[in-house]
């Protein structure tokens, strides 16, 4: 049997690369240029799995990832992976920095170091931290640096100037491990954490949904709200929760205009 394939946001050296290695160490790695390309490869079954960052412990929800998950019922969350997000500065010199390149999430996770050391530098957002490092490594003027991972610097032999510039030394990014195909209701019980996605046309319906959760002691661990783009001021809700049971799926769904059970997986976070 051939090895499974797992897609991640590349190039190699990104935190997504690290997540893929942790999630599926025996799978063949497939580096892709964007989150959209990662999900397209998964839904078209070019790969068997994908990792997608959804939350950082310092900077919160990864909004572009959630927006790509809106309305999808063709993929399933089957795991979560926590990746330590230790950031480094890559470049020629810190003496005359005019531009600092990175993924937008990294800027938010390293704001204290940036303010203290390169407060006047222009932020330039690129698709990944590894792409930022590759671009900065080509600069011959000494005016451009990048925020990236140490793995990226080591793998590509880039010049590493400063290590561990993240605001919080415990900074971590949480990834979902996804596989193709929607949720299949077999006889096995749900795992401890579940991901739900639902659309509500009126805010009063949210109270009804939460009443079901409360009555059955379902604990909400994460709630992300995004514009539905169907009608103004209506929303799609992404809910991660502990204690969801199969008999509650229909009970919650009856209050929702659309409802998708996006999978269940082992919880990797200690909340209590």
From Swiss-Prot:
Residues 194-272 form the ACT domain. Pfam families: PDT. Its EC number is 4.2.1.51. It catalyses: prephenate + H(+) = 3-phenylpyruvate + CO2 + H2O. Keywords: Amino-acid biosynthesis, Aromatic amino acid biosynthesis, Cytoplasm, Lyase, Nucleus, Phenylalanine biosynthesis. One of its GO terms (molecular function) is prephenate dehydratase activity. Residues 5-180 form the Prephenate dehydratase domain. The keyword Metal-binding does not apply. One of its GO terms (cellular component) is cytoplasm. SUPFAM superfamilies: ACT-like (SSF55021), Periplasmic binding protein-like II (SSF53850). It is found in: Cytoplasm; Nucleus. CDD domains: PBP2_PDT_like. GO terms for biological process: L-phenylalanine biosynthetic process. Pathway: Amino-acid biosynthesis; L-phenylalanine biosynthesis; phenylpyruvate from prephenate: step 1/1. Belongs to the PHA2 family. Putative prephenate dehydratase required for the synthesis of L-phenylalanine. This is Putative prephenate dehydratase. It comes from Schizosaccharomyces pombe (strain 972 / ATCC 24843). The lineage of its organism: Eukaryota, Fungi, Dikarya, Ascomycota, Taphrinomycotina.
């Amino acid at each position: 049997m051939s090895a499974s394939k797992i897609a991640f946001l590349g190039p190699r050296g990104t935190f997504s690369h690290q997540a893929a290695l942790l999630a599926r160490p025996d799978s063949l790695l497939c580096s892709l240029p964007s989150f959209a390309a990662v999900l397209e490869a998964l839904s078209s079954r070019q790969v068997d799995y994908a990792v997608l960052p959804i939350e950082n412990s310092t900077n919160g929800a990864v909004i572009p990832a959630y927006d790509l998950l809106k309305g999808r019922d063709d993929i399933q969350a089957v795991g979560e992976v926590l990746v330590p997000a230790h950031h480094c500065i890559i470049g020629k010199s810190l003496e005359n920095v005019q531009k600092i390149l990175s993924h937008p999430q990294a800027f938010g996770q390293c704001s204290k170091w940036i303010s203290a050391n390169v407060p006047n530098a222009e932020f330039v957002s690129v698709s990944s931290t590894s792409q930022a490092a590759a671009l900065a490594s080509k600069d011959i003027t000494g005016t451009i640096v990048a925020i990236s991972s140490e793995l990226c610097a080591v793998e590509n032999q880039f010049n590493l100037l400063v290590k561990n510039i993240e605001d919080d030394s415990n900074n971590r990014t949480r990834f979902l491990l996804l596989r193709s195909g929607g949720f299949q209701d077999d006889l096995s019980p749900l795992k401890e954490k579940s991901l739900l996605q639902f659309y509500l046309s009126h805010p009063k319906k949210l109270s009804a949904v939460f009443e079901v959760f409360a009555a059955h002691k379902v604990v909400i661990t994460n709630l992300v709200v995004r514009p539905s783009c169907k009608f103004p001021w209506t929303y799609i809700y992404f809910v991660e929760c502990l204690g969801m049971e199969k008999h509650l799926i229909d009970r919650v769904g009856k209050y929702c205009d659309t409802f998708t059970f996006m999978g269940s997986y082992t919880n990797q976070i200690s909340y209590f």
